[in-house]
Amino acid sequence: DPTRRTVLYAGTSGGVYKSVDQAGRWEPVNNGLVPPNLLKTSRALNVTAVQVDPYEPDTVYAATLAGLYKTTDGAKSWKRIGEALADQMIVAMVVDRVRRGTVYLAGRDGIHRSEDGGITWKTINRGLATMNVRSLVQSETDPRLFYAGTNGSGLYRSRDAGETWEAMPAVTDRR
C-alpha cells in the first residue's frame, strides 16, 4: 500500500495475505475470492498479482488464474469483476498511478485496459506479434510508457499507454 507503508499484500497459490505490521504477521484475506466449498480446488486462489489503487488505499485488485477480483474495504471481502474477461488466466497487472481508475491486465490473449475501475475492458493488442503476454510494467519516469514481455516474441514497448505496441530490439548476451 503506497500510502500506508505498514500495510502489505501478497498473492500466493493459496490466495491473498495481508500484513498490517510491515510483514511481522500475515493473515489470509480470501472472503469472496471463491465459495468456501471450493476453497481447496479453486484456481481463483492462485493469485498471480496484487495491486493497491494509489488513489484509494482500501481498493485492491487481485489477478488470479480464474479472473480478476476487487475489494473496496481493505480486503475484508472480494468481488469478481470484469465478466468480459471471465475465467481468463491473468498473469500480470498494473494499476495506473497517474490515470485514476485505470487498470491493465495481461495474459494468454494479450493486454486489456479498463478506465473505470474494472467495469468495462478494451483489448489493446495492436502491434503485438503474439497475444501470450507474461509481464507488464509501467515506467517510473513516464506514465505513458509501458513494457510487455511475451512468451516467444520478445519484449514490446508502448509509448501511448498501451494503444499501440512496437517490438524492442532483441537483447543479446554481449560477453
List where the protein language model places each region:
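Extracellular glycan-interacting surfaces
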Residues: 1-175
